[in-house]
Each structure stands twice: as C-alpha cells, then as structure tokens.
Amino acid sequence: MKKCLVLCMIFLTAVCLSACGASDRYDLTEETFFLVMTNMQYYPEQYVGKTVTYDSFTYRLTDVEGKEYMCGVRKCSSGYGCNCGKDTIIGFILDYDGVIPEPKNQSEDTSDKTWIHLEGTLPSAKKDEIKIYAYNGDEIDYDTVETVVFYHFAVSSLTPIEDASGLAYYVSK
C-alpha cells in the first residue's frame, strides 16, 4: 500500500510539473484554450520561447489612431483582457512574414470565420495595451475608449482550416 501511495505521489508530481510550466510545448485544444490563455495572462514568463499551437479565427483590430493589428483570436466570456464587462476576444497579435488570410464576417456573432491553425512562440512577456473604440450593440461608440491587452505571437507556421465544424467559436472555462 505504501509503495502504491509513493508511486501515485510521483505521478501527481510529474503531472503538476508539466502543468506548471515544465513543458517546452503547449498544444491548446478546445478543452485547454481558455485555461492556458488565462494562465498566460498571469504567468507569461513560463511561456516565453516555448512552442505554442492553437486554432483561431483571424481578426483585424484597429486602434483609436487607425493602426491595424492582425490577430488570431477566439471569443470568450467577459473579464478576459478588458474591463468592459462584455464578452470579448482572446488571442494574440500575429507577427508573421507570410500572408495571413483576411477576416470573414468579423463584425457578426457567427462561427463562419476565417479559421487558421498556428504554431509559434511568445517572444516576450511584454503586453501591448491597445486603445480601441467601444461597441454599443452593433455600432462603434466613438465617445467611449476601452483598452484591450494582447501579447505578440511569433508565427512559425500558419495553416488555413477548411472545415472548422469541430471548433467552438466561443470558448469558456
């Protein structure tokens, strides 16, 4: 019995070390996407330089000064990445030398998007705070400015996803 308990403790320690950053690779799946991205917000240093793979849709973000950022994102529950109290997007600003497919149905609340599979790294733990105009329903509210926070993602591989029927547009815990 004691030997079984020791083996269980060793196994649990190995699992905990893997979950706490001992991995050199993070494959974000439908089940782990939200948890890993949330953890990354609090402990980005453990992900810097590590290989990360994930599926997302393309999203063009424009700040209040007109600068555009191409992002790979998913939609998620309120509270992640902004203080707006509304549902928001979760993902990265994509740094890629190749062509990133153009967003599709960006302003519509639908899963009919331009989906891509990405592999790359988080080059630094520095967050970009981007000031954007708020949305009021389906319209932009130019009187209200919100701040969203993103990390950069150095893309080493980008593959368009033709059939995204198995992917959730909206991710949650």
Q: At which residue positions do the language-model features occur?
A:
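Repetitive helical segments and hydrophobic/amphipathic motifs
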Residues: 11-12
